[in-house]
């Protein structure tokens, strides 16, 4: 019981891995799991058997990350593969995201909740287009820490000159994109150099190993706003003799804290009331905070529907607009163009909307802002302005990731075609 409680109380670090194809993301995760003794004997036996069936003389640690069978047989990661492990100092959730350019949308999904992003670079190839793309997306998503793991150092004889050039190239790129808090570590995921254990092949490197850095990097606990935000997911009105007059509003707290007696405002209508109770299963809570899912009851019977947002009346209010400027990452093969119409979904709110203007597109190769663009193609990153049929209640993404983000849905196919971060 004590060991279980200790595990639950341990600090959690969520991190994602990203890089170009074959940079060694899955091998790195496999090495972390293997060297930190976070795999079971039967898992290792299965990987050894799979490695032999492929004709590999050594154990292919990339197979430890699992994923779909078809993807493993191709030797690539397509979907986002999540892994969990712990050391005596911290517990971790890893999102292994795809390297192929056509799967950038999966990388956005995997990195959206991360505290840290590991960007892998093949020491033989240096900074590539996908390196820039993944770094820029990590920056847009507000990930507070970026760890650049320069992998396959064994294939360049652990050359300090090669390492220094890649560091210089990355710093030049990161400064142009205003990316901060970057740490560089030379590694060989295949052989384990500087992953968990310090390597004697890089005497010129005096920094931490990759795992040591993951165990000690500050975890940003402030991932949501200090101001109360409660997107209403469902209105509960049970018709029963036990609860004849019950009317509750279910949802997840996406910012701040709420207590019975607090004065709230319903947006976008502006109607006000006070909190009567905070219900969770069959309990009445004294308070609720992010990211708790609860049901609120109010002292007044007012009109509230799914998609409305409850806020505290005496706190900073979110914006309520129909014209919104945001950064967008386009996911779909069908281009986005001015006047194109989409379903806009933000938290529990859904409305029709259209692209009013494409303000600029970021050129990933030159890092310049390209103006006068008529459409966005798959994997383009741009700043656009949209117009919604109904007012949107929102915060900036940097202030609240839930109320500051939205997705674009194709009304014909119901596919998610883009993700937006409100500026």
Regions found by a protein language model. Name each.
Residues 1-3, 9-34, 38, 50-53, ...:
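Helix-rich terminal scaffold detector
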Residues 164, 171-334:
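Conserved catalytic-core segments of large NTP-driven translation/proteostasis enzymes
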